[in-house]
Amino acid sequence: MKKLILTMAVSALMSTSALAANIGVSMAQFDDNFLTVLRNGMQDYAKTLDGVTLQVEDAQNDVAKQQSQIQNFIASKVDAIIVNPVDTDATAAMSKLATAAGIPLVYVNREPVNVNELPAKQAFVASNEVESGTLETKEVCKLLKGKGKIVVMMGELSNQAARQRTKDIHDVIATDECKGLTIVEEQTANWSRTQGADLMTNWLSAGLEFDAVISNNDEMAIGAIQALKAAGRKMDSVVIAGVDATQDALAAMAAGDLDVTVFQNAAGQGKGSVDAALKLAKGEKVEAKVYIPFELVTPDNLSKYQSKN
């Protein structure tokens, strides 16, 4: 069923006929495993299309730099713009710039703050973040049999995904079947493996006791694993969960270190954003929100995902 939904979501955008187009792409940062897969998905797909050129820029996690890139795309009269926002609270200004220039704009992966008021010729392609943290936390609850102490590693709080995934965690542990779970610590590690390791080291040094780590992404979860191992903690004594199902995360799961992740189809989002941009450039209609489903990954179904992302 999930495969069918995914096929429908992407195929709905794939009716674009051949179109010579120059698309400007501003990525929040290149130095991110998941966003690298997403970016590669865009570029690999564009190579299969006649006359389609992507001009891909690295915003280096700098909001001002990203806005400048968008202004440069507009000045060079690109046919469409794709943005993976550095700060999802800064997207209203980006939408205004694109609208004033009459250039289609597609946000990808990170939900813009103005997602419910996107102007004409603008769209958002991603996965529904209500699913991500919910799938992740429900599986942790199941593994802990509804009782235990958990720590939460949050992504960058300027990103809607970090805020929503964290809300998902709280919503799940408020349900009857999971109300025996208690959050004993919750801090940001900014999506970073290094910061995840540092945060976990600090918690361990403080003598914090917990049964599970619920991370907003795989990178921070892997950092937590590294710190736990360095401290001599046995990995079968703690449940570790992340989101994205990156190759590094799947390798950690195969090694018995990561217990839960959630597959986010980065390449599918990248492809979908290019299709949406091309359709909008042709003057065709695109749904304002195009969602590609998340999928729970555990050791039981790991083999299905090892060739993805």
Please give the residue ranges for each predicted region.
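A residue-level marker of the well-folded mature domains of exported/periplasmic proteins
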Residues: 3-4, 13, 20-309
